[in-house]
Curated annotation (Swiss-Prot):
[4Fe-4S] cluster binds at residues 317, 463, 514, 517. It comes from the Eukaryota. It holds the Pfam family GATase_7. It catalyses: 5-phospho-beta-D-ribosylamine + L-glutamate + diphosphate = 5-phospho-alpha-D-ribose 1-diphosphate + L-glutamine + H2O. This is Amidophosphoribosyltransferase, chloroplastic. It comes from Glycine max. Pathway: Purine metabolism; IMP biosynthesis via de novo pathway; N(1)-(5-phospho-D-ribosyl)glycinamide from 5-phospho-alpha-D-ribose 1-diphosphate: step 1/2. PANTHER family: AMIDOPHOSPHORIBOSYLTRANSFERASE. Its EC number is 2.4.2.14. Mg(2+) binds at residues 364, 426-427.
């Protein structure tokens, strides 16, 4: 999300008084971070003495994590964002742009990079794909040895430039940029408190901005501890990367909802990214995940680690393996490709059916379909061809024209389908309307039978950890039985991946995943659900800012010549 331009810098007085304006900026600066080729991990206790209340060190290495959105057009879960951080490479910004290319599937509506050169932070952000935002001329404006980057996916109305990350802030005492993958479930209450108690002025509609306001109001020293203190107020899902004039910092939430990995290039440069596919592209060797609750600090002295908040049971997002991550990534210590292949094999074992061919809804259903076909002993063929040139913004006022949307994206191969009993494997069903169109498309192409197999359990609850899902009332699996859904979409049979079999596949790691979208049981209760539980219709977040003038007691009213009332004391 892009910082708003032409805003005042935070003054020393504004830090202590509740009238503080926020120091967002969108103008370039620079910053040159010194670098040490240190391939060993320094003492992890080295930061503990700086904390006013020592934090527990040594996070559990089993912890790891994700982010997301549901598209009104194809109704698939959409990854809300991806993050990258690089320290110690003279080509940091260019490597950052390449890594963002690898993470493009996690967000297509905006991209940004902040680089550090000569003790200045400089930003380039834009709306669109990475290739559109970062042509060579823009990358040449981002010299330096450290950088962070972000790709964003948002719902309609939130794609404006000011919401494109990384966010960049100038404080009186330092400058910092942040990129965020996740969602703060206590964002509204934090923002209300900051506005009411500190006079904070927000410049975006993003929850990420609250982090920078928390840093501004923190009383901790040195600056690194302001970041740590700010993160201690956050609840929900977050994988954060920060860059300052001399440091690269990564923070992962205690539950490890969102993934964040660390690697190294051969020159010793440290790389942080949402997925290992980004490391692979820029020839960085995977080292490990950033543990849930861990803070990683990279500077010229090396790498330091401390634990923000430890948690005995991580709650990593299972949908990372079902849909979000690329198949060539390793997420939460598991191969995404192998996970999806196993999902398909389980479907073939648990829900077999007589068929002639197995096809996939491309691209996310392909690997599960391969697993299904191999287990069932039935040939896999490419029965649907996906067009990669149709944007999600294809919206027409006429329903008759709008119905062409699926046909624009998916074209049936008649030679594969005609007269065949077809098993079609997809990753999920959300509202069900797209599935019904796919079934109709296949039957119109000559399929004798269409059997839908879904490589995840039924989605019955909304996600509050970085995914813009429909309300529970809109989720078809929350309203209908499997048989009712089958009739609705028009398939000859329908089966989902059983949740208990999914957990069995995960083995000892099963307790370390979040299944809230399948069960409605949330590891961290969102504010929206708290309101429902307490019987509160809504919280008054605006503090009556837009209240009636007549209710303001200012010692009487006077009227000017135009009849406009002015308060007088």
């Amino acid at each position: 999300m892009a910082a708003a331009s032409n805003l005042s810098t935070l003054s020393s007085s504004s830090l202590s008084k509740p009238s503080s304006s926020f120091p967002f900026r969108n103008t370039p600066t620079n910053n040159n971070a010194s670098f040490l080729h240190n391939k060993s991990l320094p003492n992890q206790n080295s930061l503990s003495h700086k904390l006013s209340s020592p934090l527990p060190l040594a996070c559990n290495p089993k912890n790891q994590n994700t982010c997301v959105f549901f598209d009104d057009e194809d109704q698939k879960p959409r990854e809300e964002c991806g993050v990258v951080g690089i320290y110690g490479d003279p080509e940091a910004s260019r490597l950052c742009s390449l890594a963002l290319h690898a993470l493009q599937h996690r967000g297509q509506e905006g991209a940004g990079i902040v680089a550090v050169h000569d003790n200045h932070l400089q930003s380039v952000t834009g709306v669109g794909l990475v290739s559109d935002v970062f042509e060579q001329s823009k990358l040449s404006r981002l010299p330096g040895t450290s950088a962070i980057g972000h790709v964003r996916y948002s719902t309609a109305g939130q794609s404006m430039l000011k919401n494109v990350q990384p966010f960049l802030a100038d404080y009186r005492f330092a400058a910092v940029a942040v990129a965020h993958n996740g969602n703060f479930v206590n964002y509204r209450s934090l923002r209300a408190r900051l506005e009411h108690n500190n006079g904070s002025i927000f410049n975006t509609t993003s929850d990420t901005e609250v982090v920078l306001h928390l840093i501004a109001t923190s009383k901790h020293r040195p600056f690194l501890l302001r970041i740590v203190d700010a993160c201690e107020h956050l609840q929900g899902a977050y994988s954060l990367v920060f860059v300052t004039e001399d440091k690269l910092v990564a923070v992962r939430d205690p539950f490890g909802f969102r993934p964040l990995v660390m690697g190294r290039r051969t020159n010793g440069a440290v790389v942080l990214a949402s997925e290992t596919c980004a490391l692979d592209l820029i020839e960085a060797t995977y080292e490990r995940e950033v543990y849930p609750g861990e803070v990683i600090v990279v500077d010229h002295t090396g790498i330091q680690s401390l634990c923000l908040v430890s948690h005995p049971e991580p709650k990593q997002c299972i949908f990372e393996h079902i849909y979000f991550a690329l198949p060539n990534s390793v997420v939460f210590g598991r191969s995404v490709y192998e996970s999806r292949k196993k999902f398909g094999e389980i479907l073939a074992s648990e829900s077999p059916v007589e068929c002639d061919v197995v096809i996939a809804v491309p691209d996310s259903g392909v690997v599960a379909a391969l697993g299904y076909a191999a287990k069932a002993g039935v040939p896999f063929q490419q029965g649907l061809i996906r067009s990669h040139y149709v944007g999600r913004t294809f919206i027409e006022p006429s329903q008759k024209i709008r119905d062409f949307g699926v046909k624009l994206k998916l074209s049936p191969v008649h030679a594969v389908l005609e007269g065949k009993r077809v098993v079609v494997v997809d990753d999920s069903i959300v509202r069900g309307t797209t599935s019904s169109k796919i079934v109709r498309l296949l039957k119109e192409a000559g399929a004798k039978e269409v059997h839908m197999r879904i490589a995840c359990p039924p989605i019955v609850a909304s996600c509050y950890y970085g995914v813009d899902t429909p309300s529970s009332e809109e989720l078809i699996s929350n309203r209908m039985s499997v048989e009712e859904i089958r009739k609705f979409i028009g398939s000859d049979s329908l089966a989902f991946l059983p949740l208990d079999k999914l957990k069995t596949l995960l083995g000892d790691d099963a307790l370390n995943y979040c299944y809230a979208c399948f069960s409605g049981k949330y590891p961290v209760e969102p504010e929206e659900l708290q309101m429902k539980r307490l019987g509160v219709a809504h919280f008054n977040w605006d503090d009556d800012f837009n209240g009636n003038f007549e209710s303001i007691d200012v010692g009487g009213w006077v009227t000017n010549q135009d009849g406009f009332k002015i308060g007088s004391v």
